[in-house]
Structures are given as C-alpha cells and as structure tokens.
Amino acid sequence: MATVPTPSEAHGGATPTAADVEMVEASELRRRGKPSGDRATGPSRDGAAAAAEEAAAPSVERVFADRPVPSWREQLTVRAFVVSFFLVIMFSVIVMKLNLTTGIIPSLNVSAGLLGFFFVRLWTAAIERVGLLRQPFTRQENTVIQTCVVAGYDIAFSGGFGNYILSMSERIAGLGTEANNAQNIKNPHLGWIIGFLFLVSFIGLFGLVPLRKVMIIDYKLTYPSGTATAFLINGFHTPHGAKIAAKQVKKLGIFFILSFFWGFFQWFYTATDDCGFHKFPSLGLQAFQHKFFFDFSPTYVGVGMICPHIVNVSVLLGGILSWGIMWPLIAKKRGDWFSADLPDGSLHGMQGYRVFIAIALILGDGLYNFLKMIILTAFSLRSQIKKKNASTLPVSDDGMVTTTAAVSYDEERRNELFVKDQIPWYVAYGGYAVVAAISIGTVPQIIPQLKWYQILVAYIVAPILAFCNAYGTGLTDWSLVTTYGKLAIFAFGAWTGASHGGVLAGLAACGVMMNIVSTAADLMQDFKTGYLTLASPRSMFVSQVIGTAMGCVIAPCVFWLFYKAFDNIGISGSDYPAPNAAVFRSIAILGVDGFSSLPKNCLNLCYAFFAAAIVVNLIRDLVPKVSRFIPIPMAMAIPFYIGSYFAIDMFIGTVILFVWQRVDRAKADTYGPAVASGMICGDGIWVLPQSVLALAKVKPPICMKFLSRRTNDKVDAFLTTLGK
C-alpha cells in the first residue's frame, strides 16, 4: 500500500501534509482539526499492522472496564445539547471573523473539547452538591458534545459566508465589470440563506452511513483527527487527565480575558478604518504602504501558535514574494500592461494580477493534491480488496465482525459496541432520497439560475465524490472540500452559460457540492471518534444532525450581524476583506467567460505560477527529507490578495511557540494550544459587543493615526491657519 506522510509530523520536522494546509486556507482544505497535543496519529495502516500495534499498546478500555456504557439514548442528554448550543454560538462568531478576515481557520477542537468538558463538569458538580445528580458525566456524552459543537460551527465555514454566498452579492460583483448584472447577483438575506443551508447541509449525512462498518472496522482507516479527538476525550475522563484539563482551561481563561480586554482597549482608538493599533506602521511607513506591518492581533498570533511552523513561514514568504517584489514591479507597468486610469481595486488592473495569480497557485496546488489523493485512494482500495479476495465493496449489515486475525481486548470491545446500535439501511437510503427530492424541488426556487436537473446530476455524482473524499480523509486527514466546490463552479457555470446566469449557478452548485462532500467526511470522522470512545453510532448520527441544524440557524444569524454591523465586508483593505469571496467569483467568471477579461501578461504569469505549484508539490513528495524546508504553495497564495500583515502576526506566534518548545517542550505541547485558543476566542468574542456598538451607532472617540514627518508638518501648518 502506498505510504502517506503523517500530518502530525509538521511540527516535529518531517513532511507536512494536508493537515498543515487545512489551517492555511480554509476555503480550500477543511478538516475537523485535531488537538495539537495529540500528534501521534498517522496514515491508515493495513489491518495486520494496526492490530499488532494496538495489541502491543496499553489497553485503554481496561481502564474504563468498571464503568458501564450508557445506552445511545442515555448518551443524548439535555445538558449536552444546552452546553453545545452556547458553544456553537461562541465558535461560530470566532470562525466567522476568521472567515471574513483572511480565511485561515485553525483547529478549534482543543478549545471545543476543553470547554465542553469544563462546563458539563461544572453543571454536574453543582447538581451533585444539592443531591440531584441522576447521571454521571461520561466520555460518551463528552463525545456527543464534541460532535454537536464541531458540526454546528463547521457550518460557519462550509456555509460559504466567506466565499460562495458572499461571492453572489452586488458588493463583490462591483469589483469587476464582467457578469455584473441582475442574472448573476443575489444579495445575502437571512431568510433565503437559512433555507438554502437546511436544504443542502443534511443530505451528506445520509450518503455514506451504510459504509461506516467497512471504513472503520474492515478497512481500519485511521481518520487522524477523529482518533486524536478520541484520545483527548479518553484522557479527560481519567483522574490525571481531568487535572491536566483543569489547568488547560485555566490557561485558556486567562488569555481569553486578556485578549478580550485588549480588543476592548483597541476599540477606543479606531474612529475610522485607518485608525488604531491595527494600522500601526511598526516596520516603517514605506513597508506599511506595501501591507507589511504588525497589527497587534491576538487572533492571528494565536493562529500562528496552532499552525505548523512551515505553514507560517510559507505565508510570510508568499507575502514577501508578492507585496515585496512582484506587485511593486508590476505597478511600474501601469499604462503599459493595464490602463493608468483604472483604480487599484479593478480586476482589469492591479487587482487582477493579485487575484488571478493567487487563483493559479491555489488551483495548481489543489489539482495536484486532488489527483494524488485519487491515486492513493485507488491503490489503497485495490490493496484492501485483494486482502479480502472480494470483487465488490461490502455494505454495512447487522452481523458481527468476522475475522481470522487475533484482535486485542480494546478492538474486540469497540467492534462489539460499534455494530450493536445499527442505523437501519432504510434510514440512510430513504433519508438521502427524501432530502434530495425536497432539495431538487426547492433550491431552484431560491436560485432560479440553477435548474432542477442540474441539482439531480449533482446528487447522483455526489456520493461517489463524498466516498473518495471520506476515504482520503481517513488515510491522510486531508479533506479536499473546496477543490470539489471549485470543480463544480467550472462545470455547472459552463453548463449554464454566461447568458443564463452561469456565474450564480456555478457558485450555488459549489455550495451544494461542498456541503455534501464536507458533511460526509465529517460524519465518518465522528464515527471514528465514537468507535474509540465507545459512543454509539446512533448517538453520533443524532448529535451530528442536531449540531448541523443548530449551525444552519446560528451561522446565518452571526453572519447577518457582521453584515449589518460592518458596511465594509468584502472591500479590499478593510477590516473584513473576505478575500475568498473575490477569488470564488473570479473563478466563476473564468469558468463562464474564459480568459478574455484578464489584463495583459496576467495569463502567462498564471500559467507560470500554476506550473510552479505543481513542481513544488512534486519536489516535496519526491524528496521528503527536505520537504519540511520547502514552502507550501497554497499557503503562499493567501497574502497575494490581502497583504502580509497577518503573516507577520502568525510568524510571531510561531516564534513564540518555537522558543517555548525549546525551553520546555512538554509544557508547550500541553498548554500551547490552550493559550492560543484563549487568544483566538477572546479577540473573536469581542466582535459581539463591537457589533452591538456599531448597530447602535456608537463610534470610538479617538483616532490614532501615523503620519510621516513631512505630512505632519503640513497638517500642523494647516491647523495653524484654522486657528488664526
């Protein structure tokens, strides 16, 4: 079987993989982030190797042997969903802010797991003191909370608020002249967004349910994120793990408070967009004009502490290459390569080079890894089928596992409980058919440009793509969600045509495909987590459904709060540039109109960077010993459009973590993710009161702005004339 580098090795010095890149560009690669403290998981192994490794490892289930496993109904408690509801709100705000600023979303599983454990422990402790505790807090219930929370806040990403939904708006369409008409514009509105998400977000939950036993037990797919989450939860429910978790929560709380009040303090100095600490020319005014400055953002310092070092360095190198070298050189061609009269934000001018060269890097990287994943999946499936001497892919049934290989106590116990609570086949197939039928009839009422027969084709093809993505995720922790979405943009946009609203149809089809492929892989990750914590597949499925329903309401409401409170969302250079929105719409325009709209020599540069992305990835795979020193093309592409200020924040975060690891690696690995999560959460939650103040028309009282000495002299002279 083909070997795949371990995602967790990125910090340690081996080949960084898609797990690294997921935290690089959320619009391209999204996985259920694994806790940074558990980096021991790797690619899928063959059955014998996995069994031998587990047999040699200390038994986890013997530690919990004296604790009864609650029934699947007992795992679904009211307190679990109450805690999940509030955590979904909290993390949806954080993810939405990240989505609308840079699109870089790190793993938040550590904070989700910690806070879920902490709040339910508080709940049970309070009830126990008054003698009303009826059911102890179990790891199965903890798994239900984790699943519900991640399913809920994942809609804040996969719902397309930072990419395909915002791409449909008049605000983003106004950045260019192509497809800037009523047929290709649909402005966001709370009602249709919630309806659209309910129609497309559930169907992926039913597609792969019949294959859960095959992929988890028979093929022994690792699902590194799901495995790491299970290790985290199992650890919480041991005496030593509970003490460590309490200390981690304390660290998270301290930095949450500091980060929140730092955001509050900064707000007083931001009377306009160009004021405040986030516009501090820390590297000089000349560097500031080229987007090089430290903006005092706890969020992206925290992101830098969570992302692997190679990711942070790649982002910084991309910023230096683009804003430090390429854009100043291309700007000198103004009047030759593009009209000197065009504004800086025009896609026919300077902005066109920034956006389309970034797209070329992203597509080159995505296409290479898509083909690589298909090849790895094919080889792995062929190997598995040969071992079982079977010509067809088996489907989950109600029988027990039969195997001639010796299994450990843990594996036997987990297999027994995993096949005990079956999800009936008619629920899976019937659910898929019913939801698909409703969606086929209703989505065209919301997006008339996307016809019913196009949605039918998408739903016929989607299970195959969902299987490929879920299998690849199980092997490598690599979810190519928006690669499939971008393919849908091209395919359905070209099918519809420019004269029939092809841009809008392509973007809507992207949303349909992304939601199906994403939720299918996410559910399989949850099944793996449940398998390792003895949580019932039924409780996992129900929790995922409830979490998705929460997300379909909460995420649009959070987005609407941002959209109404801040009128500069999607505008380049603003606090919320939403870079992926412009990128997705530009991809849709390319799919419909071709390359005729590109400025001079832009296409040649795109070809060069597309090829460079493939070559760099090829070198990374062919020379794994030095791949940790080779930057990731997709990571480099992110600052091409929005600038390098966040890259400096992230680099500072990675330096902090690197020094901490040198001084005391054990503490850095244990508490680093909690500290980073506190910084991200505190700064993220500050957006809520900031939004309320903006809606109430309460403006900051002070503008802190930085001027050159010459400009300052002119301002002083002007103010002097006013005083006379």
Swiss-Prot record:
State one Pfam family annotation.
Answer: OPT
Molecular function via GO = oligopeptide transmembrane transporter activity
- Does the keyword section mention Nucleotide-binding? no
Show the stretches that span the lipid bilayer.
80-100, 103-123, 148-168, 190-210, 252-272, 310-330, 355-375, 423-443, 455-475, 487-507, 541-561, 603-623, 640-660, 675-695
Tell me the tissue specificity. Expressed in leaves and at low levels in root cortex.
Record's Gene Ontology CC terms?
A: membrane
Q: State whether keyword Kinase applies.
A: no
Q: Which stretches of sequence are listed as region Disordered?
A: 1-54
Leader sequence segment: none
Membrane topology of the entry: Multi-pass membrane protein
Location in or out of the cell: Membrane
Q: Which keywords does UniProt give here?
A: Membrane, Transmembrane, Transmembrane helix, Transport
The UniProt entry lists the main location of this chain as: membrane
Highest taxon in the source lineage: Eukaryota
Functional summary from the UniProt entry: May be involved in the transport of nicotianamine-chelated metals.
The entry assigns this protein to a family as follows: Belongs to the YSL (TC 2.A.67.2) family.
Protein name listed in UniProt:
Probable metal-nicotianamine transporter YSL13
Source species, please? Oryza sativa subsp. japonica
